[in-house]
């Protein structure tokens, strides 16, 4: 699908002012402005933000009440359960909360529980409450889940178990009352940045981030008490693709600094088995190495063992668990490849509407989210990938950048048993006999209710440059904007009238070539752009959208362009 190129522009006088006052190039100044950083003070705060810039945790509603209840439980030696989730964010949030309570003197009274994807599925359920009651637990703290767990919370109240919900997912809203009034479980207290009566969302923390803030509050704001947990919160924050702004950016920035020096056996062994040996860790390194391994446990087996891996003080145990996790991830990759191939084959036999909605009885439930993501990347449209078992279809939905998948599911909720998630990623369950009706509903929603622009991938270009302007000095300026991620993407640049040469396809359909302009020449790589080679060979010059990166090879550091899109040159903006 063709992408729309949109060039961001700013008044030249203001751009020159920001460039001069912050002592950066006009290119970097424009990137700052595009990230809504529009004063020199805001720019310097962005450049220099560190652990001491974290928000006051007591700004989060419900946190003071939670602190008092947890302190009381530790004082009175009540049994406490940390109830997490089986993805990386939920696992790391569990680790944080478990270790915080242990370090506060609750080591003999606290335990944790991660539900199975294949038994109870996502979330906080009545079955967990029943087991907790049988163990004599009187306080349950949920992390990364619970905001819609009405039945489980009601059952806990009947059994005199207090529930503290810490979550970051969207609550249900009472449409009959007010769009912004959340419909909440009757818990002892709830900590969730998404609960705000004016509908704003000033603190888009991950589940691990919320747990870290509660841990900070339990330690009266003493940052030293949570320093060794920042690397754990970083993994959850990167994994859940929350906006890398404000506290999230600080957590990731500080975590990247600290994780290479980690004293935690589980982290040391995960870095070793993932072959991570760079002196300068970047967010995407973890997205493709450690995080998939952590997620593999929840996708393929028992995620409780990952909590053990990340909390053990034994290097031998950590090594054993890291090897187990790595083997599990290899198995996950094999199954994922098989399901992806099957899904692509199925698409060739059906008529595709405005979204991909496919199901099969043989597809492993644990890899459906990854396959859905790859469907989105390949076909540039929302994707719903489902497994059918005993008449129930259950699976994952993934979306393109501008399309809110959660709103779509809400519109079609009368066909669903259950759904939940975020704008870009969600889970759903429905009776298999309703898949056709659900498919029709999704297509109807896209055609009649969503905006046409929602389905067009837009490349927001920060600045049009010449190749001469792309140098190590510019890359040094860009490094001050890191860490990059959702809502703080790598600078996206454009250039026109480029002459291609040395074209070749490498790896799995990746395009390698050199681009030249006015005497400047630069190497490029375009992932999944190998098919473009035929039309590029038929034109004299091209326009390109790209992110500049540093390529390190044999001790040399050169600037390389990561191509995002190409078109024949036409001289227009």
Regions found by a protein language model. Give the residues of each.
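Catalytic domains of riboflavin
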Residues: 1-3, 481-482
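Active-site cavity-forming subdomains of large catalytic enzyme subunits
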Residues: 130-208, 212-219, 228, 245
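Histidine-centered active-site/metal-ligand motif
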Residues: 168-169, 364, 422, 510
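Short, well-ordered strand-loop elements centered on a beta-strand within folded domains, enriched
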Residues: 182, 187-190, 391-399, 522-525, ...
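Short alpha-helical basic/polar micro-motif
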Residues: 209, 369, 373, 544
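A generic local secondary-structure boundary/capping motif
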Residues: 153, 179, 199-202, 277-278, ...
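Hydrophobic helix-and-loop "lid/oligomerization" segment in the mid-to-C-terminal part
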Residues: 2, 8-139, 159-160, 177, ...
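Mid-to-C-terminal polyanion-binding domains and interfaces
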Residues: 68, 72-76, 317-321, 327-358, ...
């Amino acid at each position: 699908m063709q992408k729309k190129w949109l060039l961001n522009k700013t008044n030249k006088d203001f751009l020159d002012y920001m460039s001069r006052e912050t002592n950066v190039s006009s290119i970097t100044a424009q990137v700052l402005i595009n990230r809504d950083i529009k004063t020199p003070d805001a720019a310097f705060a962005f450049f220099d933000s560190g652990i001491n810039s974290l928000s006051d945790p007591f700004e989060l509603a419900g946190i003071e009440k939670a602190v008092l209840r947890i302190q009381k439980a530790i004082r009175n030696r009540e049994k406490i359960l940390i109830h997490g989730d089986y993805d990386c964010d939920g696992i790391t949030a569990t680790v944080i909360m478990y270790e915080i309570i242990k370090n506060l003197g609750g080591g003999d009274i606290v335990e944790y529980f991660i539900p199975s994807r294949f038994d109870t599925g996502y979330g906080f359920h009545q079955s967990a409450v029943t087991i907790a009651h049988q163990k004599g637990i009187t306080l349950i703290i949920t992390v990364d889940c619970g905001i819609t767990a009405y039945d489980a919370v009601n059952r806990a109240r009947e059994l005199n178990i207090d529930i503290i919900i810490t979550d970051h997912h969207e609550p249900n809203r009472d449409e009959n009352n007010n769009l912004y009034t959340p419909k909440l479980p009757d818990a002892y207290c709830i900590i969730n940045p998404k609960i705000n009566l004016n509908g704003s969302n000033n603190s888009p923390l991950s589940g691990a981030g919320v747990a870290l803030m509660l841990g900070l509050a339990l330690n009266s704001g003493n940052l030293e008490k949570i320093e060794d947990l920042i690397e754990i919160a970083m993994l959850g924050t990167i994994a859940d693709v929350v906006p890398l702004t404000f506290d999230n950016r600080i957590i990731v920035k500080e975590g990247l600094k600290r994780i290479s020096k980690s004293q935690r056996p589980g982290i040391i062994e995960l870095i070793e088995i993932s072959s991570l040996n760079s002196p300068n860790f970047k967010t995407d390194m973890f997205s493709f190495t450690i995080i998939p391994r952590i997620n593999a446990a929840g996708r393929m087996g028992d995620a409780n063992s990952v909590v053990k891996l990340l909390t053990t003080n034994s290097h031998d145990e950590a090594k054993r668990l890291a090897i187990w996790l790595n083997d599990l991830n290899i198995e996950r990759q094999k199954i994922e490849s098989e399901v992806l191939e099957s899904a692509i084959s199925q698409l060739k036999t059906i008529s595709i509407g405005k979204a991909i909605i496919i199901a099969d009885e043989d597809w492993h439930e644990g890899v459906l989210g990854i396959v859905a993501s790859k469907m989105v990347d390949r076909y540039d449209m929302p994707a719903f990938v489902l497994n059918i078992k005993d008449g129930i279809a259950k699976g994952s939905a993934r979306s393109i950048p501008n399309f809110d998948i959660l709103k779509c599911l809400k519109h079609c909720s009368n066909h669903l048993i259950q759904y939940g998630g975020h704008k870009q990623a969600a889970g759903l369950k429905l009776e298999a006999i309703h898949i056709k009706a659900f498919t029709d509903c999704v297509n109807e929603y896209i055609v009649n209710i969503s905006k046409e622009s929602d389905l067009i991938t837009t490349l927001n270009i920060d600045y049009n440059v010449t190749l001469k302007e792309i140098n190590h000095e510019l890359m040094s300026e860009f490094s001050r904007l890191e860490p990059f991620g959702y809502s703080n993407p790598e600078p996206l640049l454009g250039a026109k009238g480029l002459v291609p040469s040395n074209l070749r396809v490498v790896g799995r359909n990746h395009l390698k070539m050199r681009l030249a302009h006015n005497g400047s020449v630069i190497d490029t790589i375009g992932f999944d752009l190998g098919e473009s080679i035929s039309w590029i060979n038929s034109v004299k010059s091209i326009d390109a959208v790209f992110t500049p990166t540093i390529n390190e090879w044999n001790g040399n550091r050169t600037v390389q362009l990561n191509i995002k899109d190409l078109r024949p040159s036409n001289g227009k903006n």
